[in-house]
Design a protein with these regions (language model features):
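Charged, low-complexity intrinsically disordered terminal segments
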Residues: 1-21, 26-333
Length: 333
């Protein structure tokens, strides 16, 4: 196990550089990539709080050098070997500690319990009938150093969206933009007839910083010309996806915020396939049918007859406090 950019009080200027990539590679030829974190309310059917998310499964039976799986393997090795990645622990004697032995036993017992309860769902799968052949898959990433980054992913996404002929549809859990990002959206809105974004409503957002910033800047976002749909599904939506026309799909870890743009490592897949685009649209629309369109006068267009989540007094107070006490640091959220 290695740690990317371990926190060090002697180098506080590096502490904001985080690894935000989420992917899993199996056998050097198949992988899952998306926006899902690896704790309970992102995985499985655990009780309590949940987050809805999205990943893409890529199967490469005979990966060639230029395939995306090899690009991803190279990316992993680059981060693994870079100077800001260090061993979590590298002392073999730690295995003799009681606490470590206890943790090992808990993992073994937990795995056995999981296997016994779910063995009916664990089997080899032929994905031929469940996947689509693609024309091309491109992996796009931010720089991997821990300092402020050039907005590589944002720039490439912007160029792709500006080239759209008919539509761009974005899903993101948070919107925390600066003027450069707003300007990009204005350019897209001027050239693309159907340009929309879905994000969590203020009441439905699991991130208090995202709620506070969106509540303050909603009209500024609308002034770019983009249509905003607010998700009201009860559980916070964490998916990050983009549809461009009817043949390009984007799935990954990138949020529409300044942290993803300038601070974090990020990975997205750009997939050229009409079948994938259609499948992704169907999945995205399941959530949009539980959303309302925000209008500039503060009212809503509600074609799906959605009951909004109640904005509680506690949430209103939290939004107010974040806006007035921490708004100056919005680029860090």
């Amino acid at each position: 196990v290695k740690i990317y950019n371990r926190a060090n009080p002697l180098t506080p200027w590096k502490m904001m550089g985080r690894m935000h990539d989420k992917y899993l590679i199996a056998d050097g030829k198949n992988y899952i990539l998306g926006g899902r974190n690896t704790y309970n309310y992102f995985l499985g059917d655990f009780p309590g709080h949940k987050n809805y998310d999205r990943d893409v499964l890529v199967i490469c039976d005979e990966p060639r050098k230029e395939n995306s799986v090899n690009q991803l393997l190279d990316y992993f090795e680059t981060i693994w070997e870079q100077e800001d990645s260090g061993d979590f622990h590298n002392d073999k004697k730690l295995a003799n500690r009681k606490s470590v032995k206890k943790a090992v036993l808990e993992l073994q017992e937990g795995y056995q319990q999981y296997f016994n309860e779910n063995k009916g769902m664990i089997f080899d799968t032929d994905y031929t009938d469940e996947t689509f052949e693609t024309e091309k898959i491109a992996l796009v990433s931010n720089p991997i150093h821990t300092a402020s980054k050039e907005p590589v992913v944002w720039y490439q996404l912007g160029e792709l969206m500006k080239s759209a002929k008919n539509r761009v549809k974005i899903h993101t859990p948070y919107i925390i933009c600066n003027d450069m990002m707003y300007n990009t959206w204005e350019e897209i809105a001027e050239n693309v007839p159907n340009f929309s974004i879905m994000t969590n409503s203020v009441a439905n957002n699991g991130n208090p910083f995202g709620s506070a910033d969106y509540a303050k800047n909603r009209n500024k976002i609308l002034n770019t010309g983009i249509d905003i749909w607010e998700y009201e599904g009860g559980y916070s939506y964490h998916g990050k996806s983009i549809l461009i026309d009817d043949d390009l799909s984007v799935i990954g870890s990138f949020n529409m915020d300044m942290r993803s743009t300038y601070l974090d490592t990020e990975l997205i897949l750009v997939i050229r396939s009409k079948e994938i685009n259609k499948q992704l649209e169907e999945g995205m629309m399941e959530y949009e049918k539980v959303s309302r369109q925000a209008l500039e006068d503060g009212t809503y267009h509600d074609p799906y007859h959605v009951k909004p989540i109640e904005l509680t007094k506690k949430r209103q107070r939290n939004v107010f406090l974040v806006q007035h006490l921490l708004g100056w640091a919005r680029y860090l959220f």
